[in-house]
Amino acid sequence: SLSGLSKVSAFIHRADIGGVLNVSELNLIKRLIQVQNQFKTFYNQLVEEDEGVKYPILDDKMNQLPVLTDLFQQINETCDTYDLYDNASYELQGIRSKISSTNQRIRQNLDRIVKSQANQKKLSDAIVTVRNERNVIPVKAEYRQDFNGIVHDQSASGQTLYIEPSSVVEMNNQISRLRHDEAIEKERILTQLTGYVAADKDALLVAEQVMGQLDFLIAKARYSRSIKGTKPIFKEERTVYLPKAYHPLLNRETVVANTIEFMEDIETVIITGPNTGGKTVTLKTLGLIIVMAQSGLLIPTLDGSQLSVFKNVYCDIGDEQSIEQSLSTFSSHMTNIVEILKNADKHSLVLFDELGAGTDPSEGAALAMSILDHVRKIGSLVMATTHYPELKAYSYNREGVMNASVEFDVDTLSPTYKLLMGVPGRSNAFDISKKLGLSLNIINKAKTMIGTDEKEINEMIESLERNYKRVETQRLELDRLVKEAEQVHDDLSKQYQQFQNYEKSLIEDAKEKANQKIKAATKEADDIIKDLRQLREQKGADVKEHELIDKKKRLDDHYEAKSIKQNVQKQKYDKIVAGDEVKVLSYGQKGEVLEIVNDEEAIVQMGIIKMKLPIEDLEKKQKEKVKPTKMVTRQNRQTIKTELDLRGYRYEDALIELDQYLDQAVLSNYEQVYIIHGKGTGALQKGVQQHLKKHKSVSDFRGGMPSEGGFGVTVATLK
């Protein structure tokens, strides 16, 4: 937790110019160091647990954090949250000890006075209290003359006097002197601590800056998690695609999310629809999400959002009238629009709410279209809301302009807040009037008063709305299926990676064990060869056979037929006879068989050495044989079936099996064969049919009839 962090740069600067920090200010500096150290520890543990994960930004921040352990210890050992410790210095401890003992003597003296039976009726209360930092007792005014001492205060009624008895005056004076000495010593200690702070001023300022940045990053992360935000993809080309976006200040559980998209070649979107239908909220949602994304925040949309970077976001939203300037609604809007048009460029996003409102409808609509034309020439991306019907036809007369609308539910007489991209808003006056009970005669007569073109336009818009809803439903289902498929793919990829890592670790372990065995065996072999050389040097060629056999036996003790070093199948032959050339497996050397001693042993000459060896340790050298020409014979028809079942085969194995089968079927003079691949996911069926399409022996193929196995079978016709 980063709670308790405060801005301390002002304290650090004051310490640097010779000021003295108090205990509270020192504790805020101590808290900064404490939080920094705790965060470092947490981050190091995080990195150790997630070895494969990299945090380059946080790594950079961690490397910037200074070491301030000494300063933390100095402050921590000197004071708590409220005051200096008694043992902050030897002098302070002595002063406070004297204050404590003197206070105790004063209390004892005053306790005797207030507990005296003779004084009970003279005191307002049998207690010791403090006035003006002096210990006093409450005496009734009429008994003032019975107590020798100094009056420090009296009650509001004047009935009680607070008197410091003369017996404790000197002790109270001593307390005052000690308090003065204590203040001087505390000032000295605080001055010393302030000097330590000044000495580490640069490091402290860096710590404050870095921890402030980390606090900001964590705040962004927590906010993004609270809105379940997603990371947008930024593109160089101008793009806005926000799937199921919603206003960040609205409750995600109840808000209606809408997909906001500027399709390719679309620069202007005009939203029409009923008042309070969500047009303005849509504008604000787009503007806020753009600013959030460019500020490094995750945004309230589904995964897959795409955005480009805008240099400026201009908006004219709401009726911000200026009372001082006495501007009307129209004038207020126009003032903002004029300023926007002065500064907007092709890298800007412009949002207009109720463009052209507040004046004559015909003039307002004409002005709105002219403004939109001007912004389009500038090249800005524009989203505007309006209730003017003239603007519905605007998009059909100009390239790069799209209509959109907010849906209205006639049955409930309320907006649904759903945004329909590509569908202009339509008038619902007749339907609403009918729902509210207006006479059909009146409604029908009203319909005759509007032109045929307008009727057709409304009917066209109604048809577009129905088609849009159907397509949107299908798209959402497709998005869901794609997301599920991606999740399955990710899960399988992770499992495959885990399997590969496990396989790699097994191989590495096996290699390590094999290397250890080979190393030990090699060392032993080197020792034996060394002994053999010494024997030869000592006795020349006159080496006793039993001496060689003894050395050979030491090698045999370390030889394993199934070791990793010789993990190959030995070749065995019917018989080894005298005169055969052989390979001695245990030595890896060639030799010639001189004599067969018995069924198990033979005498072999290897260079100048003659040895008796086990026959099973000998491998006969096979001479190269000329391979005979193979005759291709046609197999009997009855040995090849007219169907091939590939169910259960892996994809590559299935295609190999299919090739072999087709060759045999052609040799058997079959005209038609049945390939059974099953239904499954369809991958094997697709692979088989693509393979048949390219095969030189196949003239045609088709899917199986229901009686032949349906989609699980492909019937191939052979040439």
UniProtKB/Swiss-Prot annotation:
Instruction: Write down the SMART domains for this protein, in alphabetical order.
Output: MUTSac, MUTSd, SMR
Provide this UniProt record's keywords sorted from A to Z: ATP-binding, DNA-binding, Endonuclease, Hydrolase, Nuclease, Nucleotide-binding, RNA-binding, rRNA-binding
Question: Which GO molecular function annotation, any one, does this entry have?
Answer: endonuclease activity
> Could you tell me which residue ranges the Smr domain spans?
644-719
Which domain of life does the protein's organism represent?
Bacteria
**InterPro entries recorded:** DNA_mismatch_repair_MutS_C (IPR000432), DNA_mismatch_repair_MutS_core (IPR007696), DNA_mismatch_repair_MutS_sf (IPR036187), MSSS (IPR046893), MutS (IPR045076), MutS2 (IPR005747), P-loop_NTPase (IPR027417), Smr_dom (IPR002625)
* Residues annotated to bind ATP: 273-280
Q: Record's Gene3D superfamilies? A: 3.30.1370.110, P-loop containing nucleotide triphosphate hydrolases
Q: What class of enzyme is it?
A: hydrolase
Q: What is its EC number?
A: 3.1.-.-, 3.6.4.-
Q: Which Pfam family is an annotated match for this chain, by its short name?
A: MSSS
Q: Which PROSITE patterns match?
A: DNA_MISMATCH_REPAIR_2 (PS00486), SMR (PS50828)
Quote the gene name from the UniProt entry: mutS2
Q: How does it assemble?
A: Homodimer. Binds to stalled ribosomes, contacting rRNA.
- Entry's family note: Belongs to the DNA mismatch repair MutS family. MutS2 subfamily.
What's its job?
Endonuclease that is involved in the suppression of homologous recombination and thus may have a key role in the control of bacterial genetic diversity. Acts as a ribosome collision sensor, splitting the ribosome into its 2 subunits. Detects stalled/collided 70S ribosomes which it binds and splits by an ATP-hydrolysis driven conformational change. Acts upstream of the ribosome quality control system (RQC), a ribosome-associated complex that mediates the extraction of incompletely synthesized nascent chains from stalled ribosomes and their subsequent degradation. Probably generates substrates for RQC.
What does the record list as GO biological process?
mismatch repair; negative regulation of DNA recombination
**CDD domains noted in UniProt:** ABC_MutS2 (cd03280)
What SUPFAM superfamilies does the record point to? DNA repair protein MutS, domain III (SSF48334), P-loop containing nucleoside triphosphate hydrolases (SSF52540), SMR domain-like (SSF160443)
Query: What protein is this chain from?
Result: Endonuclease MutS2
Which residues belong to the signal peptide in this entry? none
